[in-house]
UniProtKB/Swiss-Prot annotation:
Pathway terms, separated by semicolons: Phospholipid metabolism; CDP-diacylglycerol biosynthesis; CDP-diacylglycerol from sn-glycerol 3-phosphate: step 3/3
Protein family: Belongs to the CDS family.
Keyword Transmembrane helix: yes
UniProt source species: Staphylococcus aureus (strain COL)
Molecular function in Gene Ontology: phosphatidate cytidylyltransferase activity
Gene that produces this protein: cdsA
Pfam families given in the database record: CTP_transf_1
Ranges that cross the membrane: 9-29, 46-66, 70-90, 102-122, 130-150, 172-192, 196-216
GO biological process, one term: CDP-diacylglycerol biosynthetic process
Entry's localization field: Cell membrane
Name this polypeptide is given: Phosphatidate cytidylyltransferase
Xref: PANTHER family: PHOSPHATIDATE CYTIDYLYLTRANSFERASE
Keywords: Cell membrane, Lipid biosynthesis, Lipid metabolism, Membrane, Nucleotidyltransferase, Phospholipid biosynthesis, Phospholipid metabolism, Transferase, Transmembrane, Transmembrane helix
Amino acid sequence: MKVRTLTAIIALIVFLPILLKGGLVLMIFANILALIALKELLNMNMIKFVSVPGLISAVGLIIIMLPQHAGPWVQVIQLKSLIAMSFIVLSYTVLSKNRFSFMDAAFCLMSVAYVGIGFMFFYETRSEGLHYILYAFLIVWLTDTGAYLFGKMMGKHKLWPVISPNKTIEGFIGGLFCSLIVPLAMLYFVDFNMNVWILLGVTLILSLFGQLGDLVESGFKRHFGVKDSGRILPGHGGILDRFDSFMFVLPLLNILLIQS
């Protein structure tokens, strides 16, 4: 517990100023986190980060995470790069004489999209305003807290025991309920320019998909037989273990709230 608490304090001291600063500093930080998360995901499938498919995936990830506001050329480069990456990793299945399989190639492409889109929207959301990223973080944290407390006090029915044995239906519902505190509290300080009932609905959707994001990452770990995605955060696991919910929450927040 001491190690876990110390790690959380150090992470907060490093993370909070970068989040408040935003801009280029946050973009670089998000890219570093994304590369670590990609390495964790590839390692689950026994794909070395320093290898042909690993390095191609890393390049694809960096391109996916180019800032969208830089201009229309960004999306053109992203599309062409993903096409090129697909051809390269598929060709490598032949060049490696099937030591690198078609399933591995598909996994690399999926990993780049999964990690890249999630972390790209990390700094894109912050660029729209500090209140949006705080809104996302508070939803995830209160959902997790509510799910834990309700599950501890009332949990009797397992949610998905094959993937995550400790999660319960009661905890899942409790997490949704607790997430509603966020918009009700933030509306006193921030004008979201949205009807309160619509904002509550968006919050429930984000809370729901945040919990699904957690289950997806748990599914990865269960499938590949690992306890944590990594060991970079003592007591907490890896980067993916800490940001799994945000892989779903941040893109959806942009679609439902910012770009609507």
